[in-house]
Design a protein with these regions (language model features):
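Flexible, glycine- and charge-enriched loops at secondary-structure boundaries
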Residues: 50-57, 144-148
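N-terminal [4Fe-4S]-dependent radical SAM core
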Residues: 1-54, 66-72
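A short linear-motif detector with a strong N-terminal bias
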Residues: 4-9, 57-59, 106-109
């Protein structure tokens, strides 16, 4: 097991209905984000000194498998959020390999990550919730502190 198979997780929020995808979902909130959005909803995922715990995909599965009945009965599953979950593509790929295949995997992402992550996730994510922020590059940069060229490129890729 490599360090890439460990991921910093800020929170796990269970029994979410109609918020993060179909059916009952569990939101897994990853720590860290490349953006610094002016009105960030989850600053605890990137602020210095924020709490998180390192988990392996196996540990995450053990933590959420108690909700299997809900996922199976409602067509739900796991939603990866953050922070920026697409940065944890290797972790998510391993989780998909070991989790029940009936579980849906969703992601809430800014897409402002290297395309290799999107490529790795493209075959395993069932539903993408993409927070584009703004398509105007100047407004995007003012709002997030970053350029949106990677977002546009990843949208075209998907």
């Amino acid at each position: 097991m490599t360090d890439q198979n460990n991921a910093p997780i800020t929170a796990i929020s269970r029994h979410r209905i109609g918020i993060d995808g179909e059916g009952v979902t569990t939101l897994v909130v990853f720590h860290s984000c490349p953006l610094r959005c002016r009105w960030c909803l989850n600053p605890q995922t990137w602020r210095e000194g924020s709490n998180f715990r390192m988990m392996t995909p196996q540990q995450l599965l053990m933590s959420v498998q108690m909700d299997d009945l809900y996922f199976q009965a409602t067509g739900g599953g796991i939603t990866f959020g953050g922070g920026e979950p697409a940065l944890r593509s290797i972790f998510i790929e391993e989780f998909r390999r070991i989790a029940p295949q009936e579980w849906k995997l969703n992601i809430e992402t800014s897409l402002n990550v290297p395309q290799e992550h999107i490529d790795r996730l493209s075959g395993i994510i069932d539903e993408w919730a993409i927070d584009i922020k703004d398509m105007d590059p100047d407004i995007y940069k003012e709002y997030t502190g970053r350029n949106n060229a990677q977002v546009v490129s990843n949208l075209e890729f998907l």
